[in-house]
Amino acid sequence: MGLLNLPVIESSLRRVQREFEIINQQLGWQRDPMSDEVIANLLAGYAYVDVLVQRDIDVFAMGKHKHLLQLNNIVLCGVDPTRRAEFSGLIKATENRFYDEPGGGIEDVVEWHARHLDQSVWRRAAGLYVRALSKPQLFIEGNHRTGALLASYVLLRDGKPPFVLAVENAVAYFEPSTVLRDTSKLGPMSLFRLPGINRRFARFLQDQADPRYLLAPDALTIPVPSHRPFPDHRDCASPALNDHDVVAPIAPPLFEENPHVRQDP
């Protein structure tokens, strides 16, 4: 049995979809409507987060960063192999950016997380969302959705409910997120701007915590060590999850190692 109540999560997303025109009118920057495909991909992303937490996979550990890249692939392309083949160019370009972007790739996210393990789970989840969205962004596309799933992953590992977009929180979520994408995480100004944004978004996440999104109120809590040493490169050869045990929404071989796919450096 999983940790997340996916039907309740879907119900919240469907309400946002139905009322999106009203929500959009309240935003300073108009957003594209939520299509059925966007919702299906988000639900597959939540299912993937569920499995990662159940299997105690630390996506910040060397050799496991590829699971964050997989989350982005899911929100953009879903899990259908044919659909993914259509996006092969974007997937490859995103992979290169993810590993190589100066000051904005996975290295930045992992280092930020390692420096803030002593903070509350709300601050860590918020900070990682901010790192993903602020310039330079972690991914080419889908940073908002993938960032929300990353925050949900961190929260769920601590036994907290995931963040889920709802009619009641949509405006409060979209407006600062739009500002974030134009805010640089580099340079001296970031030292003044980002901490305040982190604190406000952490309070927002805490205010949105809804136990209905969990199948049980005592969801698994994974201990977070006070420090996390980086393993050597041999960890990259560690076997990934066995695809045959993955839950139905992510049945394609998303967890198995592929020798043709770039591994964590």
Language model features by range: what are they?
Residues 1-265:
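FIC/Doc superfamily catalytic core
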